[in-house]
């Protein structure tokens, strides 16, 4: 597995469609689709499945400054930095826009205070991208900004949340006067809600690909359906036969849609 990762990294395929100047492979959408098809055909896993590559990186390419791109993107493409997401809070429930973690401007820094919860991998992450409130007087969707926070900063406390299984995939993170450079603001001040929505679009896109790329059994349903139908020819199996054919047709239509998206 290590050799596989190293070879994919050396080919710049950790982020195959990112610009070459930021460590990516420079592939256009059509060539990216070909690469994904070949990985699937060879039953190879995606080289990198993480928040940096699939979610934050595309947002930095769209909203980040040139300095931010140069600082944060190349380490992602080399697999050197781990990221976590600081969105959910203890008192907000599903109303994310009511978040209360504050970021007060002070000189060349923001001073961050508050807490995040259900943060996957925070105990191992190097950095967090966090939604914070930079204008408490503004309407709740308009006073939010997105900051990149170094998890080694003084004032950060990470507490793993032990699940009933004994695992601790999630954490609670506390910020006590954490100083974050102004240069780590992504997008405009108080414009973080729009940036976050864009980031979550990339999350949905990434999740939709995970099963398609990582489950070899789903490489091609058509031959499997044909074998199934050959062995289930009894009239009583008609409903099952129709369902199996519908699944194969849906998968084929999905791949045609991806091909069209690549061409566009």
Feature map (PLM): residue ranges:
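Internal helix-loop-helix
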Residues: 5-79, 120-127, 251
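Glycine-rich beta->alpha junctions and the first turn(s) of the following alpha-helix
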Residues: 155-255
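A short, Trp-centered hydrophobic/proline-enriched beta-strand micro-motif
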Residues: 79-87, 131
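Glycine-rich phosphate/pyrophosphate-binding beta-alpha loops
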Residues: 93, 117-122, 164-165
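A short core secondary-structure module
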Residues: 100, 108-109, 113-159
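Active-site-adjacent elements of ketosynthase-type condensing enzymes
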Residues: 91-99
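Short Ser/Thr-interspersed hydrophobic loop/turn segments at strand-loop and sheet-helix junctions
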Residues: 12, 35-40, 131-132, 148-153, ...
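Buried hydrophobic positions in well-ordered alpha/beta secondary-structure cores of metabolic enzymes
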Residues: 12, 19, 35, 65, ...
């Amino acid at each position: 597995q290590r050799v596989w990762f190293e070879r994919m990294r050396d080919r710049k395929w950790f982020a195959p469609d990112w610009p070459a100047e930021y460590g990516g492979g420079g592939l256009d959408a059509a060539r990216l689709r070909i690469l994904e098809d070949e990985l699937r055909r060879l039953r190879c896993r995606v080289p990198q499945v993480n928040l940096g590559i699939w979610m934050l990186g595309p947002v930095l390419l769209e909203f980040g400054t040139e300095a931010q791109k140069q600082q944060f993107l190349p380490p992602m493409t080399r697999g050197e930095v781990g990221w976590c997401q600081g969105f959910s809070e203890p008192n907000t429930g599903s109303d994310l826009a009511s978040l209360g973690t504050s970021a007060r401007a002070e000189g060349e820094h923001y001073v961050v205070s508050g807490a995040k919860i259900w943060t996957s991998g925070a105990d191992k992450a190097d950095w967090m991208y966090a939604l914070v409130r930079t204008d408490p007087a503004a309407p709740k969707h308009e006073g939010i900004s997105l900051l990149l926070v170094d998890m080694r900063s003084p004032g950060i406390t990470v507490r793993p949340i032990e699940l009933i299984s004994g695992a601790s995939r999630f954490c609670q993170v506390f910020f006590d006067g954490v100083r974050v450079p102004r240069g780590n603001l992504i997008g405009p001040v108080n414009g973080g809600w729009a940036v976050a929505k864009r980031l979550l679009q990339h999350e949905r896109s990434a999740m939709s690909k995970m099963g398609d790329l990582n489950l070899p059994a789903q490489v091609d349903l058509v031959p499997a359906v044909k074998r199934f139908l050959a062995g289930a020819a009894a009239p009583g199996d008609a409903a099952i036969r129709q369902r199996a054919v519908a699944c194969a047709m849906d998968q084929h239509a999905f791949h045609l849609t991806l091909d069209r998206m690549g061409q566009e």
